[in-house]
Amino acid sequence: LETEFNIREATLKDVSAISVLGRNTYREHFADIWHDIDSFLNADFSNDAIKSCINSPLSHRYLLALRNNTLIGFAKLNINSELNGMGKPCIELQKIYLKKDSVGNNLGSGLIERVMELASELDSKYVWLDVLKNNVQAPKFYQRHQFRIVDEIPYKTDRYEIGMFVMVKRLKDS
């Protein structure tokens, strides 16, 4: 099992690969919580939506994990994102998506490490995220990386009321 990978920021050349991986991994992990998953995927992972984010580096960033120049995972960040009571500057880790066969190879940890480096470079005081309450493994993963649950918020799909945990990590030098 190959565990070597590298991480870099996305460019416009990566739009299609991000769209395909985002759709596929979301469907693998979360298809059971939607009746009409395609509407969600078409909005969230359209080429136009991804291009818009890549063209707005002061607001959004995609960090890509590649193995042998093939996209195997990514993180999407919202820069200067507000979180109640935390003030700016914060970075929201909006999503980390990994190919199923890449889970457990330190890929997620590598992406988190790069997110923290970028947050430090951008003088952010906190990185925060929200995670589905029914996603049992994800909160544990983030807690291993020193994120802590600070709140619960409602979240609902066209099928279920699920709820989310809000998790925060304070950067060491802030």
How should these model regions be labeled?
Residues 5, 9-15, 19-32, 37-101, ...:
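Acetyl-CoA-dependent GNAT
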Residues 99-101, 105, 133-134:
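Active-site acidic-Proline motif in GNAT/NAT acetyltransferases
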Residues 105, 121-125:
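Short coil/turn segments at alpha/beta junctions that flank glycine-rich nucleotide-binding fingerprints
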Residues 69, 73, 106-108, 146:
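Conserved phosphate-binding and hydrolysis motifs of nucleotide-dependent enzymes
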Residues 87-91, 125-174:
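C-terminal "cap" of GNAT-fold acetyltransferases
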Residues 104-117, 140-144:
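Conserved acetyl-CoA-binding loop-helix of GNAT-fold acetyltransferases
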